[in-house]
Amino acid sequence: DEKKLNDEETLNNKDQNIKLSPDDEFQRAFDMLRNQNFEEAKFAFQQFIKNNKDNSLSGSAHYWMGEIFLLQKSYREAALVLAEGYSKFPKSVKAPDLLYKLADALIKIDKKMDSCNTLSKFIEEFSNNRLIEKVKKKIIDQDCQVAIE
């Protein structure tokens, strides 16, 4: 067993020393998430963001990290990661999703006004997005004082 463990450690160390392309690094983190290895995925997404500050996938990495925090009921951490993702990558393909999930995280930490403002921002920025009806429903459910035409 000790020999096997050492072989696994060597394999893991070799993997860490291989420089992956940003796409491969993101895919590796996403595969960990898909396999429900949440802690490893969270760490891998953090590393991806650190290593690829300007990569177009960094917004998506923030989104998936936020999702992991939401799954783990770490709502404050989710809100921080999702807000950072949106503020740094407002043009990301995941920007609407970042705002949508940010509103969820904010309501969970009793930040109703911030959640409502986030939903309002969603409507301003992404009025034709596939999530718009869900956003409007959330605004009504949370009794936000926001125009939803």
Predicted regions span which residues?
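Short solvent-exposed coil/turn linkers within tandem alpha-helical repeat scaffolds
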Residues: 51-57, 88-94, 123-135
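Acidic, proline-/serine-/threonine-rich low-complexity intrinsically disordered segments
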Residues: 1-35
